From Swiss-Prot:
It holds the Pfam family ubiquitin. Residues 229-230 form a propeptide. One of its GO terms (cellular component) is nucleus. PANTHER family: UBIQUITIN. GO terms for molecular function: mRNA binding. This is Polyubiquitin 12. It comes from Arabidopsis thaliana. It comes from the Eukaryota. The gene is UBQ12.
Amino acid sequence: MQIFLKTLTGKTKVLEVESSDTIDNVKAKIQDIEGIPPDQHRLIFAGKQLEDGRTLADYNVQEDSTLHLLLRFRGGMQIFVKTLTGKTITLEVESSDTIDNLKAKIQDKEGIPPDQQRLIFAGKQLEDGRTLADYNIQKESTLHLVLRLRGGMQIFVKTLTGKTITLEVESSDTIDNVKAKIQDKEGISPDQQRLIFAGKQHEDGRTLADYNIQKESTLHLVLRLRGGSF
């Protein structure tokens, strides 16, 4: 029968197999086609990793089923890094890798300097010098990458439509400055913007620090139409 094999790069290959084939047999076929040694393969079907020695029939793999191929580097593991844009980066790492090492790998892939990267896992910011093992980061864990601009911070602005805008700001920025940044991103003129944080409307001329707005705070943007009464 025919089954499909999908790689992380999105490439799909067709394999000719029998239900009685073992996972070892399938990995040998993949080696013939792709040149990847079986000890570097992991095969996933219906969310389960397939074990050598078991057959396709054991896992109910049928005609036209799709298996997913993940690569396992000797002694290593794969983890995922999700960016604020929703993009997911796949990295090959070791448990003994430090957060510095990880940031260097992200720089290689994405071109983002390590000093602009903040990595979050299980709600905690990861510190340089600590290892993945220190944070109990295991295979296929997902980390979140937040960008830190030099000296600045990120805040979020949520609109009434539910859209969230990310802004790079300084604590010393005034509300006027923030409205100008929103105008640059969204095309909404400052005189139509009302910004709310912690239930208070922000006054032009005051700074983010005045309102105790810190990194990753969320402000709410309400539109004020010209001629409106508020």
